[in-house]
Amino acid sequence: MTATKPSPKSMLSLDLGKRRIGLAGCDPLGITVSPLPPLQRKSFERDLKVLQWHCTSRKVEGLVVGLPLDAKGLPTDQARHYERYGQRLARALKLPLALVNEHSSSWAAAERYNLQGDRSGQLDSAAAALLLEQWLREGPELKPVHVAAHPVSQVNSDSGS
């Protein structure tokens, strides 16, 4: 599937993990991407409350969620789980969603920001920032969640950061 460069807008990017969610946002023009403090996961309800605050305060117009595809761009079990979780969050937040290939994003973020071995969550948010930069360059366009926001089989596999 060929992705098209989306029109810039205020976005929130999520690098999902079992213990933390790395967060990054961009301005409405898509010029500045900033890592945000990571979210320490507790429960879906608490995650949602924190994300709702970010979405309201930043006037977010859509979510970008990274999926850990394998080296060939094929979905992993974890990617399928994160796709469902991202869709659940997008539905609850009433926001459109874009799914992007996050293969190697943590490695690339560790290299770029010298965060090898980080356990504070900064690496997760740095990876979320790379995912958002990738989305701003390559897409795909946001989709309403009820449209089954481009199933994992249609995520642009050329883009692993």
From Swiss-Prot:
It is found in: Cytoplasm. Its main location: cytoplasm. It comes from the Bacteria. SMART domains: YqgFc (SM00732). It is an enzyme of class 3 (hydrolase). GO terms for molecular function: nuclease activity. GO terms for cellular component: cytosol. Its EC number is 3.1.-.-. CDD domains: YqgF. One of its GO terms (biological process) is rRNA 5'-end processing. Could be a nuclease involved in processing of the 5'-end of pre-16S rRNA. Belongs to the YqgF nuclease family. NCBIfam families: RNAse_H_YqgF. This is Putative pre-16S rRNA nuclease. It comes from Prochlorococcus marinus (strain MIT 9313). The lineage of its organism: Bacteria, Bacillati, Cyanobacteriota, Cyanophyceae, Synechococcales.
